[in-house]
Amino acid sequence: MQGSVTEFLKPRLVDIEQVSSTHAKVTLEPLERGFGHTLGNALRRILLSSMPGCAVTEVEIDGVLHEYSTKEGVQEDILEILLNLKGLAVRVQGKDEVILTLNKSGIGPVTAADITHDGDVEIVKPQHVICHLTDENASINMRIKVQRGRGYVPASARIHSEEDERPIGRLLVDACYSPVERIAYNVEAARVEQRTDLDKLVIEMETNGTIDPEEAIRRAATILAEQLEAFVDLRDVRQPEVKEEKPEFDPILLRPVDDLELTVRSANCLKAEAIHYIGDLVQRTEVELLKTPNLGKKSLTEIKDVLASRGLSLGMRLENWPPASIADE
């Protein structure tokens, strides 16, 4: 086996052993030493917590007001029925939420096969038992809400948000959306030519039948790869801060000198010198203004006092004056 000492091995053999329709073993080798546990643990956590699926979230049973009651002619109490409904394996196509109905009467078991649904819904395990009717005159009618989601969402997390609008008799169910029921991984020794310090990763998993084990592994690997993409190129992906553009000049400098409410004599003297804006005025010095015809010390004092009341003074330096909005006039 030739190659750089810093070059990582890539898995070349992927073996999938389909034990049953819901049980499979996936073998991946060879892996660099330590990568068996690194990849195995990451895939295991994703498969258990992040796989999307469908689950029962709400149930309404005729004649039942709360989950701590019983129903005449039914062997199980309501809590046990809800627990059995949590194990319902449903595959839904093209929808995020569906309502299923179940109506059954007479002695015998009530199974998932008794559920009425449309063509977008598939009951994967129709033999799954929901409850048992023990009386010839007994019956049970229920409406079952199935939603698409990810991970595990307890009913308590939805109680407060839905309490005001949830009618009496609508029972909330802990939703376990993950189609993966069990997963374990094992790391064994592997050998390639003269190297004996390599890993072989063996993943064994079982699903509820709504997803093929091979497809589940593929989805988990895709999720992991997408999450790691951000580390491939470590450029700052944060959105640039939008800085509020500050005006180039104080707005008061753009106002006409008439807004200073000077005496007519002072105002006319300034206009004669082409001083039309306050920004024009503050750039003049006392000496320059005293050279203005008909503008004496009294008018100068008036101008200085008015500017001072607005936080301005004579002799100020303004870069890039006048602004384009004034220069174009």
Swiss-Prot record:
Keywords: DNA-directed RNA polymerase, Nucleotidyltransferase, Transcription, Transferase. Its EC number is 2.7.7.6. Gene3D superfamilies: 5' to 3' exonuclease, C-terminal subdomain (1.10.150.20), DNA-directed RNA polymerase, insert domain (2.170.120.12), RNA polymerase, RBP11-like subunit (3.30.1360.10). One of its GO terms (molecular function) is DNA-directed RNA polymerase activity. One of its GO terms (cellular component) is DNA-directed RNA polymerase complex. Transmembrane segments: none annotated. The keyword Transferase applies. The keyword Transferase applies. It catalyses: RNA(n) + a ribonucleoside 5'-triphosphate = RNA(n+1) + diphosphate. It holds the Pfam family RNA_pol_L. Residues 249-329 are annotated as: Alpha C-terminal domain (alpha-CTD). Residues 1-235 are annotated as: Alpha N-terminal domain (alpha-NTD). CDD domains: RNAP_alpha_NTD (cd06928). GO terms for biological process: DNA-templated transcription. Homodimer. The RNAP catalytic core consists of 2 alpha, 1 beta, 1 beta' and 1 omega subunit. When a sigma factor is associated with the core the holoenzyme is formed, which can initiate transcription. DNA-dependent RNA polymerase catalyzes the transcription of DNA into RNA using the four ribonucleoside triphosphates as substrates. Belongs to the RNA polymerase alpha chain family. The N-terminal domain is essential for RNAP assembly and basal transcription, whereas the C-terminal domain is involved in interaction with transcriptional regulators and with upstream promoter elements. This is DNA-directed RNA polymerase subunit alpha.
